Amino acid sequence: MFLLTGYEYFLGFLLIAAAVPVLALVTNLIVAPKGRTGERKLTYESGMEPIGGAWIQFNIRYYMFALVFVIFDVETVFLYPWAVAFNRLGLLAFIEALIFIAILVIALAYAWRKGALEWS
């Protein structure tokens, strides 16, 4: 009897998952036009002529605000499954979730105190 019963599908999927990106890159190298000259080097802005330079510096507050948003968005992704299965998890999972929320509240207080949430 073959010992890897059931793993053939996984191995096949793994091989296909590795082959598809390689095939896409090789196809791009073969089919894509060579050389970038003239019009191909110009910036494209929805069919309009570009206005101003492409190298604009943004204020760091935008990045800090986005970073805080991503952190708390990921928090929601972690807390939603916990809330759905709350009745079945028990007291230990409740305490773990409270610790997780406490850490995030401390992080929010730190970001607030450092001014990461101030817009003006």
UniProtKB/Swiss-Prot annotation:
Molecular function (GO) terms listed?
NADH dehydrogenase (ubiquinone) activity; quinone binding
Q: Which keywords does UniProt give here?
A: Membrane, NAD, NADP, Plastoquinone, Quinone, Thylakoid, Translocase, Transmembrane, Transmembrane helix, Transport
InterPro entries (UniProt xref): NAD(P)H_OxRDtase_bac/plastid (IPR023043), NADH_UbQ/plastoQ_OxRdtase_su3 (IPR000440), NDAH_ubi_oxred_su3_sf (IPR038430)
Q: Which GO terms describe its cellular component?
A: NADH dehydrogenase complex; plasma membrane-derived thylakoid membrane
- The primary site where this protein sits is membrane
Q: Spell out the subcellular localization from the entry.
A: Cellular thylakoid membrane
Q: What is its EC number?
A: 7.1.1.-
Q: How does it sit in the membrane?
A: Multi-pass membrane protein
Tell me a GO biological process for this protein.
photosynthesis, light reaction
Catalytic reactions on record: a plastoquinone + NADH + (n+1) H(+)(in) = a plastoquinol + NAD(+) + n H(+)(out); a plastoquinone + NADPH + (n+1) H(+)(in) = a plastoquinol + NADP(+) + n H(+)(out)
Q: Which cysteines are joined by disulfide bonds?
A: none
Q: What class of enzyme is it?
A: translocase
Q: From which domain of life does this come?
A: Bacteria
Is ATP-binding set as a keyword in this record?
Answer: no
Q: Which Pfam families match?
A: Oxidored_q4
Transmembrane stretches, by residue range? 10-30, 64-84, 89-109
Quaternary structure annotation from Swiss-Prot or TrEMBL: NDH-1 can be composed of about 15 different subunits; different subcomplexes with different compositions have been identified which probably have different functions.
Q: Which family does it belong to?
A: Belongs to the complex I subunit 3 family.
Xref: PANTHER family: NADH-UBIQUINONE OXIDOREDUCTASE CHAIN 3
- What protein name applies here? NAD(P)H-quinone oxidoreductase subunit 3
Question: What organism is this sequence from?
Answer: Prochlorococcus marinus (strain AS9601)
Q: What is the lineage of its organism?
A: Bacteria, Bacillati, Cyanobacteriota, Cyanophyceae, Synechococcales
